[in-house]
């Protein structure tokens, strides 16, 4: 069993614009016992599903202003929190956090929720991870809405800016995310 940290639900009470009902699963194949949080709103049999993937250092809260508009179209909206972010469990061992760990969770979640007619909405790391999903499950994905991300092919080294950002995140584990995001508003 993986050692985890779990943020108490009361820490998420009264967040501005984020009064969405949480959903959890701890039964994803390969992730048994790890609690994954996701938002799942709108009709399960909707003609379209928006699958919203956040980046770092955010979580499903990133999409709080888009969700009502997407729901108004009659669609289903699913927005998971990657492990280590938001309401999902946070494994203690940094070695757990690999590309495959996050990507495979998405594959399992799409299958577990039986999502179809998906519009992938991705930003930052959500794009790096999510843009590989339509190639593996082309029958489930129909459209892409891609924002502020890249499509990593693995044939180029990481840029100096990305390496510096990653090191800064390691050196600042108690990052003031609200303050950081406030600078962009």
What spans do the regions from the language model cover?
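Per-ARNT-Sim (PAS) sensory domains and their PAS-associated C-terminal
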Residues: 30-33
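Flexible "cap/lid" subdomain of the alpha/beta-hydrolase fold that forms the substrate-access gate
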Residues: 1-22, 36, 41-44, 49, ...
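Short hydrophobic signal-anchor/transmembrane segments that target glycosyltransferases
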Residues: 69-71
């Amino acid at each position: 069993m993986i050692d985890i940290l779990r943020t108490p639900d009361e820490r998420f009470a009264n967040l501005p614009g984020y009064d969405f009902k949480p959903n959890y699963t701890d039964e994803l194949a390969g992730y048994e016992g790890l609690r994954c949080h996701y938002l799942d709103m709108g009709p399960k049999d909707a003609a379209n599903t928006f699958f919203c993937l956040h980046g770092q250092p955010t979580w499903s809260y990133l999409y709080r202003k888009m969700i009502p508009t997407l729901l108004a179209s009659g669609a289903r909206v699913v927005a998971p929190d990657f492990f280590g972010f938001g309401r999902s469990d946070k494994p203690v061992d940094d070695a757990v956090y690999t590309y495959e760990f996050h990507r495979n969770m998405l594959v399992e979640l799409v299958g577990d929720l039986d999502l179809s007619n998906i519009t992938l909405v991705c930003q930052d790391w959500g794009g790096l991870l999510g843009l590989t999903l339509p190639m593996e499950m082309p029958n489930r994905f129909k459209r892409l809405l891609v924002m502020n991300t890249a499509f990593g092919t693995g044939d180029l080294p990481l840029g100096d800016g990305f390496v510096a950002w990653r090191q800064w995140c390691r050196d600042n584990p108690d990052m003031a995310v609200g303050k950081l995001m406030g600078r962009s508003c």
